[in-house]
Amino acid sequence: MSFEWPWQYNFPPFFTLQPNVDTRQKQLAAWCSLVLSYCRHRKLYTLDVLEAQESPVFNNKKIERKLSVEAIQVVFEELRKKGNLEWLDKNKSRCLIMWRRPEEWGKLIYQWVSKNGMVNSVFTLYELANGDDTEKEEFHGLEDWMLLRSLQALQTDGKAEIITMDDGKGVKFF
Amino acid sequence: MVVCEKNVLLLLFAKRKMDRFMWTNGLLEMNETLVIQQRGVRLYDGEDKAKLDVGGVVLSTHRLLWRDQKNHECCICIPLSQVIFFEEQAAGIGKSAKIVIHLHPAPENKEPGPYQHSKYSYIKLSFKEHGQIEFYRRLTEEMTQKRWENTPVSQPIPTGTGPKAGRTRAVGIVGIERKLEEKRKETDKNISEAFEDLSKLMEKAKEMVELSRSIANKIKDKQGDITEDETIRFKSYLLSMGIANPVTRETHGSGTQYHIQLAKQLGDMLQAPLEERGGMMALTEVYCLVNRARGMELLSPEDLVNACKIFESLKLPLRLRVFDSGVMVVQLQSHSEEEMIASALDNVSDKGSLTAEEFAKLLGLSVLLAKERLLLAEKMGHLCRDDSVEGLRFYPNLF
């Protein structure tokens, strides 16, 4: 399934950081949603800034425009403020992209658990993310760190409890 | 031996002497450096051969010395400061080349020398063994640099105080000659000074401005003596030169008569050009246009700005406007900014996108003004920009 680019993607000014404040706000909002939807589509959970420059998201070869490093940083900062991005290092070279926030994942997982009547059962993390049963679910293939955070969110809500077992972690749903 | 000789000289040559010379031991003082020496030189007192034998002449930074070749203890010198000027005399048949050196009269407190009096005011050095070209060159150098002025030697050498001292004691044709020569040199020096170094010219220009300022102030003080007419004329000369005259501003307040008149004149003059150019002109364009039309009595930039500033208060149909970037324009009052921006948006939408240059061409505006208009439209949110290696383009704001 190919990715559907938004109309801004082919609009050259999209790749220039606009000086007019109002225009810039709209521009950044469009960028944020583009980055998130692209990452969701490709199931990307981490981004490397230098690599990102060459990625099709920030580099539209067809109209020969690319977003400058400074502008990319601005977009990432905007995502961070919204809670969709977390820097992995002080130099801001790698980051976690949360096109869905942990709470949202947690909700999805819990919905599946309760729909299948598996409340009160125990799962290993591996089962949840990579098991055959969950193959059709959106959270299938979820990276460990995100899975853990989502379960932690559920835990805070009192809907789950993370257990440490012999060969890893597991979770019990209530 | 030395004393003997001295007495002999004094006795024999009481009348015709080179009286500026002093006896010296021939040793150089501290701070005094040897420049050049030449043997085979005979001294002449004016046109007459000095009754000294052939010797060697030595040029130092401070003095001209001559030493007898046969009798080394016979050495005389003269300070370079005594030299007024010198020239070459070409060799002839049977005659060696010479350097003629004109001197100041001997001062009262001069030390004893080989001659007491001399009727001549110049001496000659005759170069029997050549060497005059180099010697002349070095002498010129030393006389230009005047190094003896910077590092005075301990021995008290009576120094000439310059052309002025010479002038007061000069008599006869020689004196007149000397005066003319000094004047010529002075003029020459001034001219070469002024042209040699442009910064010096600037200083002189500053002096001129100071001078005219002081005259203006004097006029202010003596208001009664000079007629009103003349004062105004003088002030207008100063203004047309571009010299701000504080007098006028104080006496008439801001918005002086001159500026008011000027503003009215500009109001008439600029109507047609402004309409041709779509109602707006950069101030620099106005400046060029106005001064070209005037021919004489040009406007200074300051005057133009001051006149433009009072358009509004005089209810003239023109306005001076300053953009964010600092660009100043004169525009017709009837010129509406909203209209301009709306039309700009139409133009850009029509063509999809425009650069400042393309827009300027389209409207017949200067590129500077075209850019200002596009920037204004962007500020209003009607346009957005595309900045790439291809340049700066403006698009309709679709965000």
UniProtKB/Swiss-Prot annotation, chain A:
Record's keyword annotation contains tRNA-binding: no
Name of the protein in its database record: Vacuolar protein-sorting-associated protein 25
Gene designation: vps25
Keywords: Cytoplasm, Protein transport, Transport
Function: Component of the ESCRT-II complex (endosomal sorting complex required for transport II), which is required for multivesicular body (MVB) formation and sorting of endosomal cargo proteins into MVBs. The MVB pathway mediates delivery of transmembrane proteins into the lumen of the lysosome for degradation. The ESCRT-II complex is probably involved in the recruitment of the ESCRT-III complex.
Subcellular location: Cytoplasm
Subunit structure: Component of the endosomal sorting complex required for transport II (ESCRT-II), composed of SNF8, VPS36 and 2 copies of VPS25.
GO BP term (any one): protein transport to vacuole involved in ubiquitin-dependent protein catabolic process via the multivesicular body sorting pathway
UniProt xrefs under InterPro entries: ESCRT-II_cplx_Vps25-sub, ESCRT-II_cplx_Vps25-sub_N, WH-like_DNA-bd_sf, WH_DNA-bd_sf
PANTHER family: VACUOLAR PROTEIN SORTING-ASSOCIATED PROTEIN VPS25 (PTHR13149), VACUOLAR PROTEIN-SORTING-ASSOCIATED PROTEIN 25 (PTHR13149:SF0)
Family named by the database record: Belongs to the VPS25 family.
GO molecular function: protein homodimerization activity; structural molecule activity
Entry-linked Gene3D superfamilies: Winged helix' DNA-binding domain. Chain C. Domain 1, Winged helix-like DNA-binding domain superfamily/Winged helix DNA-binding domain
Main location: cytoplasm
